[in-house]
Curated annotation (Swiss-Prot):
Gene Ontology CC: extracellular region
Name of the top EC class for this enzyme: hydrolase
This protein's name: Cutinase 1
Cystine pairs: C46-C125, C187-C194
Induction comment from the UniProt entry of this chain: By contact with cutin.
Family stated for the protein in its record: Belongs to the cutinase family.
Gene: CUTA
Additional record remark: On the 2D-gel the determined MW is: 20.8 kDa.
Organism the protein comes from: Colletotrichum gloeosporioides (Anthracnose fungus)
Record site feature (Transition state stabilizer), residues: S57, Q137
Active site: residue positions: S136 (nucleophile), D191, H204 (proton donor/acceptor)
GO terms of molecular function: cutinase activity
Signal peptide: 1-16
Regulation: Inhibited by diisopropyl fluorophosphate (DFP).
Length: 224
């Protein structure tokens, strides 16, 4: 049964992928599917904002080509590219389909990698405003990692945006052990993953507008 569920998810994602890739912002964001400014940046040149993002299953790079780069582009327009470091969760986070079916909605390796990046942001740039986001499986990566961070790092995180939150029902629309006012969940009314399933319907690919408008506004309000 699990194999059939994974197969069904894979077929659905494969069929829907061209719709996502060819949306209006796709050509603009193709070249930014991998971002590593937190990893490569110097502590002597810390930015105002550090944005950490976990992509959806099967998306390329460490940022993907949908919600992650869209939010990043908006933040760079608001604060200036030199004042924002963008960092995707990569490496041990494979963004594979099978990890969606694990108890945490992703792998422990992925959660630990995101936690490492949050810790790096804190140690390298303790005065920067950290914001983060995730899409689909990436939301589980964010929820799992942030819930286990120290109070100091949680306080440094100003806002989190989650698109198509796969643990929305299970976590009651929030990130466990994290201030609800700092989290904004974007779940389309027809997106089945927001209701405790892993059925991928067309609505799961409709978060581009939220990523371009509502999410950056929320993060800007949190950052100040």
């Amino acid at each position: 049964m699990k194999f059939l569920s994974v197969l069904s998810l894979a077929i659905t994602l494969a069929a829907a992928a061209p719709v996502e890739v060819e949306t209006g912002v796709a050509l603009e964001t193709r070249q930014s599917s991998t971002r590593n400014e937190l990893e490569t940046g110097s502590s002597s040149a810390c930015p105002k904002v550090i944005y950490i993002f976990a992509r959806a299953s099967t998306e390329p790079g460490n940022m993907g080509i949908s919600a992650g780069p869209i939010v990043a582009d908006a933040l760079e327009r608001i604060y200036g590219a030199n004042n924002v470091w963008v960092q995707g969760v990569g490496g041990p986070y494979l963004a594979d389909l099978a990890s969606n079916f694990l108890p945490d909605g992703t792998s422990s390796a992925a959660i630990n990698e995101a936690r490492r990046l949050f810790t790096l942001a804190n140690t390298k740039c303790p005065n920067a405003a950290i914001v983060s986001g995730g899409y689909s499986q990436g939301t589980a990566v964010m929820a799992g990692s942030i819930s286990g961070l120290s109070t100091t790092i949680k306080n440094q995180i100003k806002g989190v945006v989650l698109f198509g939150y796969t643990k929305n029902l299970q976590n009651l629309g929030r990130i466990p052990n994290f201030e609800t006012s700092k989290t904004e969940v974007y779940c389309d009314i027809a997106d089945a993953v927001c209701y405790g399933t892993l059925f991928i319907l067309p609505a799961h690919f409709l978060y581009q507008t939220d990523a371009a408008v509502a999410a950056p506004r929320f993060l800007q309000a949190r950052i100040g």
